[in-house]
């Protein structure tokens, strides 16, 4: 038992070894998350790692997921992905924006604050959660329509 745990911990520390959640979000820094969505016709995940998770709800073209995962040091409590043709992905980070900036800088070398790159769909934008000041949102919006995040708050 302890050997398996030790092997897992060793693997997690090596550069090439990532959790399924980290693999799923590996394109976050450049918002290259094309396979991270539900198929609009079948409702099935297009990404094998996404298939591990069950959406809490699917509404208005988005699939909402609640969970407790860590993404390169960021405490993630949920995410949303498209369940239609929208190109909006969001991670809900369980820490205030000042701490989230520090954590994203440590993990990605960026505070995800470049609005121009975000508007071009080339980088995420770190936002203060308007519904919960103790949380932050990492927003990746791509595509010509530049769809905004849904007005609905993240389900508690």
Regions found by a protein language model. Give the residues of each.
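Extracellular/secretory pathway and lumenal proteins
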Residues: 15, 35, 142-145
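Sec-dependent bacterial lipoprotein signal peptides
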Residues: 1-15
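Short, exposed beta-strand/loop patches in secreted or surface proteins that constitute
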Residues: 53-56, 80-81, 124-130
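Long, charged/polar, surface-exposed segments that mediate recognition or autoinhibition
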Residues: 62, 67-122
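N-terminal export/targeting and maturation segments
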Residues: 17-69
């Amino acid at each position: 038992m302890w050997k398996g745990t030790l092997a897992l911990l060793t693997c997690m520390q090596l550069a090439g070894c990532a959790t399924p959640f980290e693999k799923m979000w590996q394109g976050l820094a450049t918002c290259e998350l094309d396979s991270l969505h539900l198929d609009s016709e079948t409702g099935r995940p297009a990404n094998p790692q996404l298939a591990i998770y069950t959406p809490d709800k699917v509404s208005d073209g988005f699939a909402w997921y609640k969970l407790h995962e860590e993404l390169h040091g960021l405490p993630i409590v949920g995410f949303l992905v498209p369940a239609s043709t929208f190109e909006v992905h969001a991670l809900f980070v369980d820490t205030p924006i000042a701490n989230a900036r520090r954590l994203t800088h440590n993990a990605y070398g960026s505070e995800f604050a470049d609005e121009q790159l975000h508007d071009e769909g080339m980088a995420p934008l770190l936002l203060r959660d308007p519904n919960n000041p103790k949380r932050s949102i990492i927003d990746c919006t791509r595509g010509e329509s530049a769809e905004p995040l849904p007005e609905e708050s993240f389900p508690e």
